[in-house]
Amino acid sequence: MTTLLQINASINNDNSQSSRLANQFVAAFRDRHPDAKIVSRHVAANEPVPHLDGERFGAFIAPPEARSAAQHAVVAYSDSLINELQRADVIVLGLPMYNFGVPSQLKAYFDHIARAGVTFKYSDKGPVGLLTGKKAYVFAARGGLYVGTPLDTQTSYVRDFLRFVGISDVEFVYAEGLNVSPQSKEAGLAKAAAEIARLAA
């Protein structure tokens, strides 16, 4: 049975354009794969992922036998996020752009799943990702027009991070110009909808 993990990163939950795009794809995927297991994770709304601080980082690097109860709880939370990824065959990310970057809660999520020896390992040829054999779809919603410009650091950051943990098969779908004008918004959403239909076919 195929497992799809949907990660929505908007602070506006399902009311955001990025979440709506991701939801559209997941609905189409479910229609084509009725037996698929769908798992949802909202990293910025409902129960936001905590930001990394010294105490949380210390929990990750402490030897298991030396961890306090609080540190064990931090690692257990990280493990639960990682386990979702490990079990997933398909990953869907709803990605808004906030001030040219990713939501800070998504960065916090990445910080909790990038664990040496768990999701990647070091080798004499560089880091090796361990979350292999997965397909990822990223649905990015932006108010302006950024694809192909130096301001689109978001795409390379997300692609590089996913590759770092072993997820190299990644497709991006963009809905851009959503705040430029009503016509631009309509065109941007229509283009994204066409891409979703193509990917879900």
Segments and roles (model prediction):
Residues 1-95, 102-104, 108-111, 194-201:
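N-terminal beta1-alpha1-beta2 submodule of the flavodoxin-like/Rossmannoid cofactor-binding fold
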Residues 5, 39-41, 137-139, 171-173:
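Hydrophobic/aromatic beta-strand patches that form the interior of the parallel beta-sheet core
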Residues 10-13, 97, 142, 176:
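Residue-level signal for short, function-critical loop segments
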Residues 13, 47, 145, 179-181:
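Flexible, glycine-rich phosphate/dinucleotide-binding loops
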Residues 30, 114, 166:
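Hydrophobic/aromatic-lined pockets within catalytic cores
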Residues 34, 133-134, 167:
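A short helix->loop->beta-strand "cap" motif at the edges of active sites that frequently abuts
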Residues 71-156:
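Helix-loop-strand module that forms the ligand-binding subsite of alpha/beta enzymes
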Residues 147-201:
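Glycine-rich phosphate/pyrophosphate-binding loop and the adjoining helix
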